[in-house]
Each structure stands twice: as structure tokens, then as C-alpha cells.
């Protein structure tokens, strides 16, 4: 099955308005086949939607598991949709590790995002200790299963899953193309047990120190449909090169 490649730039807590302008100018000249999404920090979401070409999607890096109410500092899915977001990253390893997000919370965020019309980008991944102990497949499929059990497999007809090995996030280490492909294939096969058609159509992204010089080999793998890009998404030239590698 042909799946449209997607490259999402996760700026994390980086960037200023001048980066929005620089990136918008660069993406205005991009006419490739890959779908492109930019995920800046909360304060820049509306400005990003105004600045970016219409074909570029805007995503949030997080969302509340609550609809509304007395939750100081939280941002709801309907609010994100109202300012022009079409996507939201859910369950990033930094959210799990630094803020203690649980599988149950992540599943709730996933459901709230979809209810507001947002496309969740669900992140799964293992630590180096878990990989070294041979538990990679158990961990990542368990993280996926927690959400499938909560929302149903049909929800993944309009979702994206990103495999981000925790040991490769911001470390300069990258899973080899073969290592990444093996996990992506495992995730697709795992979901196929519930629904083969959804499993085949689901886009699986790789995230973990993807750069312009290693993107093409990663994206050439049969079950890798693009990338969730961190540091390399903060420079227009490198991000465009990665988008081109995904075509």
C-alpha cells in the first residue's frame, strides 16, 4: 500500500518568531510529495498557522486530558483546533519521563484530541536498558496496546504513530535503519492482529536524531513512512533536506 510520507518538526521548547518566518519562507518553496507538519511551542501556534503555507500542517506538542475547567496552565484540544492546529504529539518520551505521563493519561489525551478533530501523533519507544534486556517489542507494543484498548483500533484510521527510541532522543545516537525497520514492522504486525487494513494504512514515523545525512536510509525502509524530527527541524536547510529525503 502506498502511504503518503510525513515529516513533522518538533521544536520542543525552542524557536522564536524569526524562526517561524525563516521556516515559512523555506517551506513556501517546497513542492515535494511529503506531507509536512510544524510543531512549535504553544505561544507560536496561531502565528505559525498564519505564517506557514496552507499545505503545511500545524501541530501542538501536548494537549490536556481535560475538556475545560479549573486546570491552570492546561490547554484543551478544542482550543488547539480553534487556533489552527490539525495535529498533536501525544506521549512523547520527554513527557513520559519528565512529567510522569502514564499510558492511561496518554490514551485520554488521544481520545480528547480526536474528539476535537485533531490527528494524534502517538509516540512509543524503549529505553536503552529495555533494549539491552531484549524487551523492545514488549515495551513499544504495550504502549500501543494501552491506547488501542482505550479508544479502539478504528481510531487509528485517523492517527499516526511515531517510534522514538528513548536512547536516541537528543543523544546523537540513531537506531540503524535495520533496527528502526524491525520495530516499525513489529508495530504494524501487532496492529494487524486487530485490523489488517488499518495496520497497512497507518503511517509510522521514526524519531531519534534524524538528520539530513541519515534520513534517506531510514526512510527507505518499507515500514518507515517519515520522521518526527527534533533538533534538525530548527534549521530550515536541514529540515527541507529531510523532507526531500522522505519523498
From Swiss-Prot:
Compartments where located: Cytoplasm
Gene designation per UniProt: tpiA
Record's keyword annotation contains Cell inner membrane: no
Subunit structure comment from the entry: Homodimer.
Pathway: Carbohydrate biosynthesis; gluconeogenesis; Carbohydrate degradation; glycolysis; D-glyceraldehyde 3-phosphate from glycerone phosphate: step 1/1
PROSITE patterns assigned to the protein according to its UniProt record, in alphabetical order: TIM_1, TIM_2
Full protein name: Triosephosphate isomerase
Any Pfam family: TIM
Gene Ontology MF, one: triose-phosphate isomerase activity
InterPro entries referenced in this protein's UniProt entry, alphabetically: Aldolase_TIM, TIM_sf, TrioseP_Isoase_bac/euk, Triosephosphate_isomerase, Triosephosphate_isomerase_AS
Catalytic activity: D-glyceraldehyde 3-phosphate = dihydroxyacetone phosphate
Taxonomic lineage from the root: Bacteria, Pseudomonadati, Pseudomonadota, Gammaproteobacteria, Oceanospirillales
Isomerase is among the record's keywords: yes
Disulfide cross-links: none
Active-site residues annotated for this sequence: 92 (electrophile), 164 (proton acceptor)
E.C. number: 5.3.1.1
Family: Belongs to the triosephosphate isomerase family.
Reported function: Involved in the gluconeogenesis. Catalyzes stereospecifically the conversion of dihydroxyacetone phosphate (DHAP) to D-glyceraldehyde-3-phosphate (G3P).
Any one cellular-component term (Gene Ontology): cytosol
Amino acid at each position: 500500500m502506498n502511504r503518503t510520507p510525513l515529516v513533522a518538526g518538533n521544536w520542543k521548547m525552542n524557536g522564536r518568531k524569526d524562526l517561524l518566518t525563516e521556516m515559512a519562507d523555506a517551506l513556501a518553496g517546497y513542492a515535494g510529495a511529503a506531507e509536512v507538519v510544524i510543531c512549535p511551542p504553544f505561544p507560536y501556534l496561531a502565528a505559525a498557522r498564519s505564517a506557514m503555507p496552507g499545505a503545511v500542517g500545524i501541530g501542538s506538542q501536548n494537549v490536556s486530558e481535560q475538556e475545560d475547567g479549573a486546570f491552570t496552565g492546561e490547554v484543551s484540544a478544542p482550543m488547539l483546533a480553534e487556533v489552527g492546529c490539525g495535529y498533536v504529539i501525544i506521549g512523547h518520551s520527554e513527557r513520559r519521563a519528565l512529567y510522569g505521563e502514564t499510558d492511561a493519561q496518554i490514551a485520554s489525551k488521544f481520545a480528547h484530541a480526536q474528539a476535537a478533530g485533531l490527528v494524534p501523533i502517538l509516540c512509543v519507544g524503549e529505553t536503552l536498558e529495555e533494549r539491552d534486556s531484549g524487551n523492545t517489542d514488549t515495551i513499544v507494543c504495550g504502549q500501543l496496546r494501552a491506547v488501542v484498548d482505550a479508544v479502539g483500533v478504528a481510531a487509528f484510521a485517523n492517527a499516526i504513530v511515531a517510534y522514538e527510541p528513548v536512547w536516541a532522543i537528543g543523544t546523537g545516537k540513531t537506531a540503524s535503519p535495520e533496527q528502526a525497520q524491525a520495530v516499525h514492522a513489529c508495530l504494524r504486525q501487532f496492529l494487524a492482529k486487530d485490523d489488517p487494513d488499518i495496520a497497512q494504512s497507518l503511517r509510522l514515523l521514526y524519531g531519534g536524531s534524524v538528520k539530513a545525512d541519515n534520513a534517506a536510509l531510514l526512510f527507505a525502509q518499507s515500514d518507515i513512512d517519515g520522521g518526527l524530527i527534533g533538533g534538525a527541524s530548527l534549521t530550515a536547510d536541514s529540515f527541507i533536506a529531510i523532507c526531500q529525503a522522505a519523498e
